[in-house]
Amino acid sequence: MLKSLRFVWWLTKAFILRHGKTIVWTIVISVFMALAGLKILPKLLAAIKPSRAFSTIAMVGKVRSNELPITILFKLSQGLTQIDESGRAIPGLAKSWTVSENGKSYVFDLDKSKIWHDGTPVTAKDINIAIEHVQTEVVDNQTIKFTLEQPYAPFPTVLSKPLFKNRLVGTGNFRLKKLVQNGEFTDSITIEDGSRTEIYKFYLSSADTITALKLGEVDEIADLISINDVPKWNQFEIKPERHLDRYLAVLFNTQDKFLAEKSVRQALAYDIPNKPQDENRVISPISKSSWAYNPLVKPYNWDISQAKELLKGVEEINSVKLEISTFLPYLSRAEEIAAAWTDLGIPTSVKVTLVLPSEFQVLITGQQIPADPDQYVFWHSTQSTNLTKYANPKVDKLLEDGRETLNEDKRQEIYRDFQRFLLEDPPAVFLGHITTYSVFRK
């Protein structure tokens, strides 16, 4: 036993004498790395963790805090209802609702699972909705009642606007982090969810947003109507987005002496070149995805011979001149149409405007398509928002019936007739869906 221990000792001693320096350096380095690891490891682990996505987005417009863009509001909260792809109202903060037989009373039952961002449950007393000619009554904590003076079938879709408790305390995936104001206007708003922070900055013009992108003040520009002024730099990426809820249209002033003639408006509608031939095409003011859409209306495909035929016998044709008013983003389209009408024998000029003109002969502009097929405010003869000053007793009656009829099948029939009669006597020509652009820094 003693001999064995001596042998092990001599062997160990010989190994240390031979490799002593290596052993010492190994111990020193190991201790150093262990100590360094205590400081470095947490940083390494933090680096491995997924980082929070962070982006600064430029938008055009002078924005008040109570008039934030609807795209931001929908990220922060939801309404009593939501709108599905077909334009129907579906549950939002309310899980269900009922309507009285006379169509004047709506009772909404709130979803008990809905929580405000401050951690409190959504209750009926939190719901602050003020609509003209509508009475609101809190029945109990989970029930709210609306009483209308007249039946209004689209009412549930009206209640899809995002609701807030106090100052922008909502129920959405994103919540407000910071709001920077300059007087009554908002300079920027910061919102965040569990993994992403978005800062929206507001600028007076698209040129200002492009300058901000060049200077590195923002990472992205959202919802540009035109990209003509965006520099073709490699570090910028442009992404188009077609909006199925917006269209570009040619509006006629139907009280203009020349344009009051139905045949003249039809002729001009036929002689608009380069109408889209794909899914961008729009032939009606009601969305193609709507349950009330009528695909069998007169489409006014480009047909010069038909346009000339319709103008035969029109006495003013040799003396009339037309002026198209439009906004800068639609200038090239307006010039294209003006050239076509001039070739048809009707000299046409183009005027660029900065604001919606109170008077015009022809106006080319964009329009938001309502979720519900109700088009009363746009085409009924009594409405100040009827830009074309259109007056058609048959169309008026259909619009009145459409908003007072609760049965969807009957409403569908009414609005299909409305589209057919409107396009037979066109106060407007619907061209195509509007495309906007987002510009990203790569």
Enumerate the predicted regions with their spans.
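Ligand/substrate-recognition segments at binding pockets and active sites
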Residues: I27-A34, E184, K312-I369
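N-terminal lobe/hinge region of extracytoplasmic solute-binding protein
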Residues: S55-E101
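Aromatic- and charge-enriched surface segment that lines or borders ligand/interaction sites
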Residues: S96-Q135, A212
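Gly/Pro-rich hinge or "lid" segments in bacterial periplasmic/extracellular proteins
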Residues: N141, T147-Y200, L204-D208
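Extracellular/periplasmic solute-recognition and catalytic clefts
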Residues: L179-F185, I199-Q255, G366-Q368
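A bilobed periplasmic-binding-protein/Venus flytrap-type ligand-binding module shared by bacterial periplasmic
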Residues: E192-D193, F202, F236-A267, D271, ...
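Periplasmic-binding protein-like
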Residues: Q255-W291, L296, R333, L422-P427
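Extracytoplasmic/peripheral linker and loop segments enriched in polar/acidic and small residues
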Residues: S349-L354, Y376-R441
